[in-house]
């Protein structure tokens, strides 16, 4: 019975840790950690948007 409880707890820990990867980039530090750069307008053609840096006007862009 203890094994079932341990596996259940481990399952929830794995699920809660994975939820952060679905949220995207929302600040400058996490943008740079994801190998991106902050651009005040649209991303250049050779880059794609992966999030925002300081709100909607500033985009976080990374090479395609």
UniProtKB/Swiss-Prot annotation:
Gene: DEFB1
A Pfam family assignment: Defensin_beta
Gene Ontology CC: one annotated term: sperm midpiece
Subunit field text: Monomer. Homodimer.
Annotated localization: Secreted; Membrane
Annotated InterPro entries: Beta/alpha-defensin_C (IPR006080), Defensin_beta-like (IPR001855)
PANTHER family in the record: BETA-DEFENSIN (PTHR20515), DEFENSIN BETA 4A (PTHR20515:SF2)
Entry keywords, A to Z: Antibiotic, Antimicrobial, Defensin, Disulfide bond, Membrane, Secreted, Signal
Role played: Has bactericidal activity. May act as a ligand for C-C chemokine receptor CCR6. Positively regulates the sperm motility and bactericidal activity in a CCR6-dependent manner. Binds to CCR6 and triggers Ca2+ mobilization in the sperm which is important for its motility.
Gene Ontology biological process terms in this record: calcium-mediated signaling; cell chemotaxis; defense response to Gram-negative bacterium; defense response to Gram-positive bacterium; positive regulation of flagellated sperm motility involved in capacitation
Signal peptide: 1-22
Protein name according to UniProt: Beta-defensin 1
UniProt organism field: Ovis aries (Sheep)
């Amino acid at each position: 019975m203890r094994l079932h409880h341990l596996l259940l707890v481990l399952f929830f820990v794995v699920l809660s840790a994975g939820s952060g990867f679905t949220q995207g980039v929302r600040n400058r530090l996490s943008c740079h950690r994801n190998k991106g750069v902050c651009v005040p307008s649209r991303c250049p053609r050779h880059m794609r948007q992966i999030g925002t840096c300081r709100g909607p006007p500033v985009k976080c862009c990374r090479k395609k």
